[in-house]
């Protein structure tokens, strides 16, 4: 397998929020609980990272990561490539960026079809569509009106590579994702539409940012890197060891209040990447 290297590519969507609609206060649950099968628990010597997997947007990627994690494949694997304010890459048994699992490569899941049941919450209007959240993921999408003229009554959408978003690494072949993945610590719009986002860090982004970085001159390759000591879905852990994670829905009053606060602080520079999920973690 050729090196799985994450590089900037063609910009597919502008993240700058050129206008922002008033956020309506609707009747909505104050919290939602992340399903154990969609909670990836990554332990490191630096601390724990909790990732919500998003099978509605990248089902093959999520199934692959679940399978490998619960097999113990990721235990002891290195964060072999880490670039400050960009991303941390792991999941290679060789620790070089050249390796993968024995499972076949999967197709690139760079976009998905959004139906009304996804629960997209519009936050702003971008250059060519709507910007908002679905679950904990930042999303760019065509308006709902497009659903009326499509055969499946859905519209095109893609999750965005904001801080905390987790994506599948690949080589130059767009359908070469296997076991490696990367966790964003900064914003890189050039990845949008070119790599498959499949989840988001809900807790532990500060841990990711403390992982030992590599030099830019070495393309982020790390000498004596940090590693994942264990990675499992919460569903695969003994019940007494399972963390319980609750997230404020994007339409909740608490989240919408945060949006307006951040929008006021950032002004014309406001983007969906300025927003992080509001999370509560207990147990584990």
Language-model segment annotations:
Residues 1-10:
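Bacterial N-terminal signal peptides that target proteins for export
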Residues 11-12, 22:
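Cleavable N-terminal signal peptides
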Residues 22-284:
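Cyclophilin-like peptidyl-prolyl cis-trans isomerases
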């Amino acid at each position: 397998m050729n090196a799985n290297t994450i590089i900037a590519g063609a910009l597919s969507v502008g993240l700058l929020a050129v206008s922002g609609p008033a956020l309506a206060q609707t009747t909505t649950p104050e919290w939602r609980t992340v399903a154990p099968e969609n909670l990836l628990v990554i332990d490191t010597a630096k601390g724990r990272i909790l990732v919500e997997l998003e099978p509605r947007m990248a089902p093959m990627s999520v199934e692959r990561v679940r399978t490998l994690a619960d097999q113990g494949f990721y235990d002891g694997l290195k964060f072999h490539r880490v670039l400050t304010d960009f991303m941390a890459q792991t999941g290679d048994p060789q620790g070089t960026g050249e390796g993968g699992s024995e499972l076949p490569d999967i197709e690139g899941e760079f976009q998905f079809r959004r139906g009304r049941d996804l629960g997209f919450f519009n936050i702003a209007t971008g250059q060519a569509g709507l910007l908002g959240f679905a679950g904990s993921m930042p999303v760019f999408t065509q308006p709902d009106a497009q659903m009326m003229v499509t055969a499946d009554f859905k519209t095109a959408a893609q999750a965005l590579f904001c801080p905390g978003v987790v994506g599948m690494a690949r080589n130059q072949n767009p359908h070469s994702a296997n076991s490696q993945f990367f966790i964003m610590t900064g914003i890189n719009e050039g990845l949008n539409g070119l790599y498959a986002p499949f989840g988001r860090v809900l807790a532990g982004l500060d841990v990711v940012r403390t992982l030992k970085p590599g030099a830019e001159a070495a393309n982020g390759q790390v000498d004596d890197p940090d590693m994942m000591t264990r990675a499992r879905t919460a569903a695969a852990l003994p019940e007494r060891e399972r963390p319980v994670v609750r997230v404020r829905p994007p339409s909740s009053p608490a989240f919408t209040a945060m949006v307006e606060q951040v929008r006021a602080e950032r002004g014309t520079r406001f983007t969906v990447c300025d927003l992080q999920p509001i999370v509560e973690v207990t147990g584990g």
